Amino acid sequence: MTHGRVNPDFRLEDQGITGLGTVYYNLIEPDLIQYALARGEGSLGKGGSFLVTTGKFTGRSPKDKHVVKTDSVADTIWWENNREMSPEGFDQLYTDMLAHMEGRDYFVEDLTGGSDPKHAINVRMVTELAWHGLFIRHMLRRPDREDLDDFIADFTVINCPSFQADPAKHNCRSETVIAMNFDKKLILIGGTEYAGENKKSVFTLLNYLLPEKGVMPMHCSANHAVGNPVDTAVFFGLSGTGKTTLSADPARTLIGDDEHGWSDTGTFNFEGGCYAKTISLNPEAEPEIYATTEKFGTVIENMVYDAETKDLDFEDDSLTANMRCAYPLHYISNASQAARGGHPKNIIMLTCDAFGVLPPISRLTPAQAMYHFLSGFTSKVAGTERGVTEPEPTFSTCFGAPFMPRRPEVYGNLLREKIATHGATCWLVNTGWTGGAYGTGSRMPIKATRGLLTAALDGSLADAEFRKDPNFGFQVPVDVTGVPGILLDPRRTWDDAEAYDRQAAKLVKMFSDNFEQYLPFIDEDVRAAAIS
């Protein structure tokens, strides 16, 4: 039995998926919420939001992501970073997952990834949970209803949380599995209810496909000046570094908060919504994001709330520090409906420095920008991955290693070409610690970060006096209006300057040791920009 609107020539049966219970195609938000409530998947929150918990999986499982190793991708996948799965293991996984799905009801959403029609892909999302359908309707882009009659997916994603993989049988690591088969244009997800796996699977897919078209896929947020898409800025960074918060600037138009492409015509969002962290969310500092938590259809994931009043507790991280809300882009009043911008005028690389060494903002040369892009230094922030309970310094190349199927140089060279062709001023912004390392120092004040970014984006920072950092070689402003001068010189924020020097030397060595892996693949100017 089927319900909903679908291309009559492209039902699940036409894809060889049969024997299911009722299949619900392309239900809209009210219907998905009704089914989710009736099935006991969650509770209704204030304003019609949907409150849900995801069990033991409250973050991504990057170690359980696999790519099927076939002849077509054997030479293009970065296997040191992507776990391989045999074609035979995948086929058995698919067979067993379909057998597990028999007789169960499923929800199908036909959506697109990419706001630029020239580079968009059609994605069919098949979900066991109704609220996952709601989530992915927010995250990807919705075709017009009449276009569903002719919709044919380029790739299909099947998410079955109740299915558990068998490592010996399916050639995977654990009972949780995310398996991508580029030949069969199929992604299988099992053993986890964490909704972020859905969107990141599509992101990984686009990260593989788009470089062949000369498009730079980016783990970044983006905005542009009001009424002036030419003045576009992108914000690279891992989860928890401030991409969503800092790009949601009321003085600028939001393009998107997490995943974008940079083509020959400019910047475009892959998604149709936002997936914001809500821990310590403040209505004064982030009023737009805070307001979405009481809007109809917003998915509130893994937040503690009062059972009687449905009031959310933004400070209680007993379920996870990775509490989130997912909502459509149009819930942000200053969001771009086209979700597109020009070529980036400013490129901001966000890092959460748990060592407390890096200044709050630094200007980079193009060679330094490629160096820091390939390095991807930051700290894993609590909760974004399973097992991370406090910040851990790490190097995540391209500011998103878990989502990069190709070698880092592919993305680094694309970025370098785009900067050379279109020009951009590049900045490294530390949203991490100041006055000491994690545990002794304090988090960089968001007011100061916003002030520095405003000065960078409006061009006034370019006129400031800069000094060369003795440890890292980049340019650091000496004085910026509205920002305490002591913040601009990290060494001065420490009580013990010699302790800072030791910490800085430690971080410099970490950078140097990490970058050795890229030396054979880079040009001399980038090698010269390397920290040593």
UniProtKB/Swiss-Prot annotation:
**Which GO molecular-function terms appear in the entry?**
ATP binding; metal ion binding; phosphoenolpyruvate carboxykinase (ATP) activity
Ordered alphabetically, the record's keywords are: ATP-binding, Cytoplasm, Decarboxylase, Gluconeogenesis, Lyase, Manganese, Metal-binding, Nucleotide-binding
Q: Does the keyword Lyase apply?
A: yes
Q: Where along this sequence does the record place binding of Mn(2+)?
A: 200, 219, 258
Give a yes or no for keyword Zinc-finger in this entry.
no
The pathway is: Carbohydrate biosynthesis; gluconeogenesis
What Gene3D superfamilies does UniProt report for this protein, alphabetically?
A: 3.90.228.20, Phosphoenolpyruvate Carboxykinase, domain 1, Phosphoenolpyruvate Carboxykinase, domain 2
The protein's superkingdom reads Bacteria
Q: Name one GO biological process term.
A: gluconeogenesis
Q: Which reaction does it catalyse?
A: oxaloacetate + ATP = phosphoenolpyruvate + ADP + CO2
Which cofactors, if any, are listed as required?
Answer: Mn(2+)
**GO terms for cellular component:** cytosol
Q: How does the cofactor attach, per the note? A: Binds 1 Mn(2+) ion per subunit.
Where found, per UniProt? Answer: Cytoplasm
Tell me its EC number(s), please: 4.1.1.49
Residues annotated to bind substrate: 60, 194, 200, 324
Q: Where does ATP bind?
A: 200, 219, 237-245, 286, 324, 449
Name the protein family: Belongs to the phosphoenolpyruvate carboxykinase (ATP) family.
Function description: Involved in the gluconeogenesis. Catalyzes the conversion of oxaloacetate (OAA) to phosphoenolpyruvate (PEP) through direct phosphoryl transfer between the nucleoside triphosphate and OAA.
| Full protein name | Phosphoenolpyruvate carboxykinase (ATP)
Q: Which organism is it from?
A: Roseobacter denitrificans (strain ATCC 33942 / OCh 114)
The gene behind this protein is pckA
